[in-house]
């Protein structure tokens, strides 16, 4: 039952402002990774998906959890933690956006530990997240290929 780390790198032929707005909008992000995501608490700031906003993710039937945005720097950075539910703990997600001459380089990292002491549970969750998020980001990048 050890700490699991995921790091996904993806480039996009679109400005950081465009990719940031897609990936930090909770419902839009759900479409990208093919998951049911709904914002349940709006941020008190300018962007309703910003600092303090909460999204509910329904991963599988009967399995739902909430994530709270802890850092929100427009077009640069979003961080979040699981704040309710989930079979994992000590979870932290971080999306870093780098604008490079009108293109975007994204570094997406997730760290977590499984709550339950089942052998290989962490590895199974890690593989599922890598596939879902990685495939979704690749599909999004393909939309901007020239």
Regions found by a protein language model. Name each.
Residues 1-44:
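Hydrophobic ligand-binding cavity/cleft-lining segments
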Residues 83-134, 146:
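Beta-strand/loop substructures that line and gate deep hydrophobic ligand-binding cavities in soluble
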Residues 15, 62, 74-75, 100-103:
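Short strand-connecting beta-turns/loops that link adjacent beta-strands
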Residues 31, 40-86, 135-146:
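Glycine-rich portal/gate segments that line the openings of hydrophobic small-molecule binding cavities
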Residues 8-10, 66-71, 91-99:
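Hydrophobic/aromatic beta-strand elements that line small-molecule binding cavities or substrate pockets
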Residues 11, 15, 61, 83-85, ...:
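Structured loop/turn residues at secondary-structure junctions
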């Amino acid at each position: 039952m050890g700490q699991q780390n995921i790091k996904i790198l993806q480039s996009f032929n679109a400005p950081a402002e465009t990719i940031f707005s897609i990936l930090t909008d909770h419902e839009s992000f759900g479409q990208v990774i093919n998951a049911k995501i709904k914002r349940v608490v709006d941020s008190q700031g300018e962007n309703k998906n910003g600092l303090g906003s909460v999204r509910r993710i329904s991963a599988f039937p009967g399995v739902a959890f909430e994530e709270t945005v802890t850092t929100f720097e427009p077009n640069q950075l979003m961080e979040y933690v699981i704040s309710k539910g989930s079979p994992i703990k000590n979870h932290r997600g971080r999306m870093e956006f780098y604008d490079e001459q009108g293109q975007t380089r994204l570094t997406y990292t997730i760290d977590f530990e499984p709550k339950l002491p089942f052998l290989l549970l962490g590895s199974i969750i890690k593989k599922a997240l890598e596939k879902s998020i990685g495939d979704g980001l690749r599909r999004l990048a393909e939309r901007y290929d020239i």
